């Protein structure tokens, strides 16, 4: 069975994990109510999408 020959150092381990991270959500301002919302989705506060009301609040 394969076993590591040397212990992985903290620096090597951390260099490997530099790309192991979460991305922040892509928030944009709603043109109707100026609240933050996810792009390409209906605004949860006013219900508008692409300039028209999709969900009545």
Curated annotation (Swiss-Prot):
InterPro entries: Ribosomal_bL32, Ribosomal_bL32_bact, Ribosomal_zn-bd. One of its GO terms (cellular component) is large ribosomal subunit. One of its GO terms (molecular function) is structural constituent of ribosome. SUPFAM superfamilies: Zn-binding ribosomal proteins. HAMAP family: Ribosomal_bL32. Keywords: Ribonucleoprotein, Ribosomal protein. One of its GO terms (biological process) is translation. The gene is rpmF. It comes from Halothermothrix orenii (strain H 168 / OCM 544 / DSM 9562). Pfam families: Ribosomal_L32p. This is Large ribosomal subunit protein bL32. Coiled coil: none annotated. PANTHER family: 50S RIBOSOMAL PROTEIN L32, LARGE RIBOSOMAL SUBUNIT PROTEIN BL32. Belongs to the bacterial ribosomal protein bL32 family.
